[in-house]
Amino acid sequence: MLEKALWIRTPQDIGTVSPEFRKNISVLSKVKKATAFVSAMGAYELFVNGKKAGNAVLAPGFTSFANRVLYAEYDITHLVSENTTLSILCGDGWAHHHFGFSKRIFVPHISAIAAFLIEYENGEKEYICTNETWQVYTSEILFSALYHGETVDKTADVKFIGNAAVDDTPHPALQKQTAFVTEQEHIKPAKMIRTPKGELVLDFGQNIAGYVEVKVRGKKGDKIVLSHAEVLDKDGNFYTENMRSARNLCTYVLSGEDDVFKPTFSFQGFRYVRIDESPENITEANFTAIVIHTDMERIGSFCCGNADLNKLYSNIIWGQKGNFVDIPTDCPQRDERMGWTGDAQVFCRTAAMNFDVEEFFDKWLSDMALEQRDDGAIYRFVPFVGWWNGNISAGWSDAAIICPWEVYNAYGNKEFLRKHYPMMKKWVDYVHGAGEEEFLWLGGEHFGDWLALDAGEGKFLGATQKDFIASAYFYYAASILAKAQAALDIDNSETLELAKNIKASFRKAFMKDGMPVLYPKYDGFTEKREVKAITQTSLALILHFGLFEEHEKDALVKALCALLSESGGAMTTGFLGTPYILHALSDNGCVKEAYDLLLRKEAPSWLFSVAKGATTIWEHWDGIKEDGSFWSADMNSFNHYAYGCVFDWMFANIGGIKILDGGAGYEHISITPHTDARLGFAKCGIKTRHGELSVKWSIEKEYTRYELDIPAGTKAVFTLPSGKTEELSKGSYMFIE
C-alpha cells in the first residue's frame, strides 16, 4: 500500500517544534472500510478529524534504522466523515534524537509516509498518499525529546508553513509493525510532600516508565513545570544526579480553559515528580502517572508466605514493565535507555515466565540479525547507536543465541527458532574464529562479571578473569546451538564435537586439579583491579555450564560454599555470575544455601533493596548504602532489571517447575518443589500455550500439602521429597507427605 506514497518533510527548518502534516479529503459515498498505513522517521501519531487513530504511543518504535522502519495499519472507518482531515503529528522519537553515549542522530530531519485506502460500499476504491500536496503546520508541541521531556504551549499560534517537501534522502525498508507500546496503567499519587528544601513533590509510590497526565484549569499563560526523579536523597530531598544529562522536564502553558497535558513524544523513568511551577490551586488530584510499555500478556504469577519475597517479585515485574518499552533497555530514566544485550540475555528466561514476550523479542532479535556483521559478530546493544566502535563482549553478544533459545523453550514455537537460527549459527562460528586458540575465546574488551563486588571498592569489572568467562560462554553457546539444531532436525554432530573440544580446551587452560586457575594471556579493559582464579562467579559458571567432571563436583560446590562463608554469607557476583549462583548451589545439593542467599536482607542481597523501599530492581546491589548515601552519581539506576533474573530460580525451585530437554513450551516438564519453612507456603503459576499450569505447596504441622494443576498437552513428572515420583497429565492433583 505504501509503494505509491512519498516520504514528506517540512519545506523549511522549524526548529524543535513538532510538525503536523495535513490533508483534507472529501468522502464521496458510503464507506465500507477505511484503512491507514503510516510510518515516520521520528515518532508520530495519526489523527482523523481530530481524533487519534489507535492506541499506540511512540510509534513506529526503535529499529535498526539503517535497515528498516516499521509501519502500522489502522482501521479508521469509524473516524472518517464526508469532509475528513487527515493529520500526522510528528516528533523526534528515536530516529531524530541525540541518542546514546555517542549522541547519534540517525536521520537529518523528521519525515513521514502514509497511504489511505477507502473502500466504498459500491465496490469502488480510493487511494490517498502522502506527497507534496500535503500541508505542513506548526503545533502546540514546542519541544520534545525522549531524554529531556516535552514543552506544550496551549496558547501557541499554530501556523501554516507551506506544502510538504518530498524527502529524497535514502530511507530504509518498510516492514509491518505488530508489537506496540501502549498506555497500560494509571496511578494516582500516594501523597504530596514538602521536602526539607521546601520542594513540592508528588510521590506515586512506584517507580515506573511512562509520564504524568495533568488535568487543570488556570489563567491563560500560567505554567506547570514538572521534574522527574526515581528516589529522594538521604535527607529526603529531590534527587536527579543519577539522570546524568537527561533533563526529564515537562513544561505546559495553560490555555485558560480546561486543559489536559501529557507528553506525546517523550517518556520518563520516575517515582517522584517535583512541581517546579504551577497555578496556586494545584493539588495532587490534578495528576495521574501513566505506565507505558510494549503490550504483552501477563502470564506468570507467584506468591508465598514471605512478604519480602512477594515484594521482590513485584519489583521484578515492575522492572520488566519499565524496561520493555519497545526494546529491552538497561534503564528507562537516564541518558541511555539502550538495548543492552547482556541485560536482556540474563533476564530473558524470567521475562518469558512473567509475560508473553515472543513477539517483543522477535522484533528486537530481527534487528539484531540485521545488524549482525558479516563475520557473525554481534554488538553490545541493539539497535546499534555507535560508541566503542561496536566492540563485542562475551555474555552480552551471546544474547544472539541465548535469547532465541530461551524464547523458543518457553513457548515451543519452532518457526520462531527457525527464523533466528541463522543468526545463532553465525554467532557461534564467529566466536570459533575469534582468537588465536581455536577452542578458546581469548582477548577482546569484555565487560566480564560487570559490577561484581570482588575486585575492590568502586570497581566496575569483577575479579573473575574475562578470558575465563568468554571461553565458558563459548561452550555454553555451542551447547545451546546443538540443542537448537536437534529441535530443528538439523544434524548437530559437528556442533557437539565443537562443544566437546571447547570443554577440553577450557579445562586445560582454566582448570587444574578440578579447580579454576588463571590463564597467562589475560587481556581486556585496562582498569586496575585484582584478578582471581577462584571466585563465586568462576565456580558458578563451571557448575552451571557443566564444565566439570563428575568426580570434581563436590569439591567445586564446597569451594563455592566456602567463598560464601568467607564473605559473611553474601554474594559478590555481578551481571554474569548472579544468574547462575543459586542454580549452581541448588542443582548440586545445596538448596538451603541457595535459599539463604535469596532470603538474605543485608547488603549485598536481593532483599536489601526491598528493605530500603525499592519498588523495582536496582543496577547496584548497594545503589543506596546502609547510611542512605548513593553508590555513585553517574551510574546508579534504580530501575535496572538484570538482577531480577533470580525469578527463574524461584520458579524452577520454589515452584519446582522445569522444562525438560525436548519439552519446549511446557510440553514435558519436571515438578520438584523445594520447600522452606521461612516461606510457609508458595504458589507459582503460568499460562502456557497449553493452558494454566500451577504448583502450590503449604507446610502444615505434620505434613506438606502439594496442589498441582496440569493443562492438556503437558506431561509432568512430579517428585516428592521422599523421592517418590508420579507421572501426571491433564488434571488437578493433591499430594501429602
Name each region found by the language model:
Residues 12-16, 60-65, 75-77, 102-107, ...:
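Alpha-helix capping and helix-loop boundary segments enriched in small/acidic/polar residues
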Residues 56, 471-489:
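Conserved, charged catalytic cores of large soluble enzymes
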